[in-house]
Design a protein with these regions (language model features):
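Post-DEXD/H (motif II) to motif III coupling segment of the RecA-like Helicase ATP-binding lobe
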Residues: 1-9, 183
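Helicase-core coupling region on the C-terminal RecA-like lobe
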Residues: 7-29, 41
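Conserved interdomain hinge at the start of the Helicase C-terminal
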Residues: 25-71, 78-82
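Short, high-confidence coil segments that cap the C-terminus of an alpha-helix
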Residues: 63-64, 89, 109, 128
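Conserved RecA-like helicase motor-core motifs
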Residues: 65-67, 80-101
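Helix N-cap/beta->alpha junction signal
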Residues: 71-73, 115-116
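Short, aromatic/basic amphipathic alpha-helical patches
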Residues: 79-86, 175-183
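Conserved RecA-like P-loop NTPase helicase motor core
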Residues: 96-182
Length: 183
């Protein structure tokens, strides 16, 4: 983020694994990268999920309020399941199709699990968020990152933190470079 480093921290985690269930470049009939299939592979890869969970728990132990965003609901369900194995922290979904009362209940949780779509469509959390974890590859993140910058600077208890898990293969390497330019 093109701001002073003491106002926002960015933790870029470059991730790669040569296991083909994760890193195989899949092409469509036109010979172009099939991002949708590859994102499915990325979000279903257990070692990457473990890294993601480690980041979530590290932030929670630091007293952070976290928004975890993914393009895949199944990915969020996997994270939800991992969160359910502990009892110390609260967590909930913020997804399309949920009742307003359920969304408001989720806003009170330590960890909000949402889709990029929901975070960009009128997401207005009344409780200040200070951490966003980009759990699946994405190019345009400006609006999502803005969700942790809403609290007035003088009222912040923590410096806002962006954790970007950057997949280092195929089209995702280029997406990472676009995000770095934004930061």
């Amino acid at each position: 983020i093109k701001r002073e480093p003491e106002k926002v921290k960015v933790k870029l985690i470059e991730y790669y694994n040569d296991d083909t269930s994760y890193s195989k470049e899949v092409l469509n009939q036109m010979g172009k990268a099939n991002s949708a299939t590859m994102i499915n592979n990325i979000t279903q890869f257990e070692p990457r999920l473990k890294l993601l969970m480690d980041q979530i728990f590290e932030c929670l132990k630091d007293g952070r309020k976290i928004l975890v965003l993914s393009d895949r609901r199944d990915h969020l369900k996997d994270i939800f399941y991992q969160m359910s194995l502990q009892e110390e922290f609260t967590y909930g979904f913020y997804l399309g199709g949920m009742k307003q009362s359920e969304l408001q209940e989720t806003e009170t949780k330590d960890v909000i699990l949402g889709t990029f779509t929901m975070a960009s469509e009128g997401f207005d959390c009344k409780y200040p968020l200070n951490t966003i974890i980009l759990a699946s590859p994405k190019t345009n993140i400006e609006q999502a990152v803005g969700r942790i910058l809403r609290e007035e600077e003088s009222k912040r208890k923590k410096i806002p933190l962006v954790i970007d898990i950057a997949d280092n293969f195929s089209v995702f390497s280029r997406q990472k470079l676009k995000r770095i330019k934004y930061y």
